Amino acid sequence: MRRYFGTDGVRGEAGKPPLTPEFVLKLGQAAGAYFLAQEKRPVVLLAKDTRESSDLLEAALAAGLMSQGVRVEHLGVLPTPGVAHLTKALKATAGAVISASHNPYQDNGIKFFGPTGEKLPDGAEEEIERLLLEDHPTRGIGTVGDFREAERMYLDFLLAHAPDLTGLKVGLDLAHGATYRIGPKLFQKAGAEVMAFFNTPDGRNINRGCGSTHPEALSRFVVELGLDLGIAFDGDGDRVQFIDRKGRLFHGDHVLYLAALAFGEKGVVGTVMSNMALEVALKERGLAFHRAAVGDRYVLEKLKETGLALGGEPSGHVIFLRHHTTGDGLLTALLTLKALKALGGDLADWYEALPLYPQVLLNVRVSDKAKVMADPRLGEAVREAEARLGGRGRVNVRPSGTEPVVRVMVEAEEGAEEVARELAERVRALSQEAQAV
């Protein structure tokens, strides 16, 4: 059982337990000891996003790693999937990223990639947590470097997958995050006419009213400025959402459907949050559909288990396994545009080709996720909600892996909003009871 690592590394509010500089130093020592056991002269690539706390946590993590004799190569501000790509391409021992993805600036996190460019498996994270309990005297004097070719190498990798975008008017929402420099460069080099929004990070504005979790402003810009489409990234660039020319959200389920048809896939891996309409549409075309737990690491596991190459989440984490080991917002954007070129039409046409079932997702902030989820009354409430839908919808209640939140999802052709609201109130009441005990 992991205490610190969640579905996407270690997360929390920067400066508060567990994300204090003291803890991050110890985490670096434990990770350094782990990497030293894998390789005689370990090299770790280290990148960050644009949060004001990223420099502090980067320094603490680097110091811990170097105290174990690890060489640390600083990559600067770079999207998370860029670190995954470079870790594999440069044959580094590991990659590490200081980021909390789509979370607000007060939060931050640390995630590691192994030499294959995949996130460390659960067993490796458990071993690092075990090593956290031990003292780690200095085993060597690690060195540090600034790898100035990181952005260029990642850009070259992306451009190798880019279609000709000449004449396309694209609005980019960079979320004041890790894609703020490389995003506009990439689409301009591919030939697009680019309008960049939310591309002036100040350490505190990352994801604030913008990015893939808040695409409303981009939707407005696309319609008002007559753009062909909009593309919104999150703070660390591993997820993406699209806006069609009519201002509608073209999300991960639409992308999976479009890409599956364009690239001749045999099937798709979604998650328990994927819309039922995607499953039905794929099966009508003779394509398999599998559901994984939420989190791109679990999508990747299911892809390997099933032998498929395309998977993702409605939130915009999409894995094209033939091209990358993890979700990559920039790569997904390019391959989605390549799919459109192959099949014809634009995002608006393909939005209408997959009418999604109404889905309501409510986030309920709770005091103790584990207590709420273990309460047998929650299971009863879910069964009651399912009974109300009469077999014509789905209910899913799950804890967030990165926030103190329980997510309530109800999907149905009718009545989803009312059922979701009532179920969310039950979750809130259970949380208040648990807090009072």
Swiss-Prot record:
GO terms for molecular function: magnesium ion binding; phosphoglucosamine mutase activity; phosphomannomutase activity. The modification Phosphoserine is found at residue 101. One of its GO terms (cellular component) is cytosol. Its cofactor is Mg(2+). Keywords: Isomerase, Magnesium, Metal-binding, Phosphoprotein. Pfam families: PGM_PMM_I (PF02878), PGM_PMM_II (PF02879), PGM_PMM_III (PF02880), PGM_PMM_IV (PF00408). Mg(2+) binds at residues 101, 234, 236, 238. It is an enzyme of class 5 (isomerase). InterPro entries: A-D-PHexomutase_a/b/a-I, A-D-PHexomutase_a/b/a-I/II/III, A-D-PHexomutase_a/b/a-II, A-D-PHexomutase_a/b/a-III, A-D-PHexomutase_C, A-D-PHexomutase_C_sf, Alpha-D-phosphohexomutase_SF, GlmM_bact. Activated by phosphorylation. It catalyses: alpha-D-glucosamine 1-phosphate = D-glucosamine 6-phosphate. Binds 1 Mg(2+) ion per subunit. Signal peptide: none annotated. GO terms for biological process: carbohydrate metabolic process; peptidoglycan biosynthetic process; UDP-N-acetylglucosamine biosynthetic process. Its EC number is 5.4.2.10. The active site is at 101 (phosphoserine intermediate). PANTHER family: PHOSPHOGLUCOMUTASE (ALPHA-D-GLUCOSE-1,6-BISPHOSPHATE-DEPENDENT), PHOSPHOHEXOSE MUTASE. Belongs to the phosphohexose mutase family. Catalyzes the conversion of glucosamine-6-phosphate to glucosamine-1-phosphate. This is Phosphoglucosamine mutase. It comes from Thermus thermophilus (strain ATCC 27634 / DSM 579 / HB8).
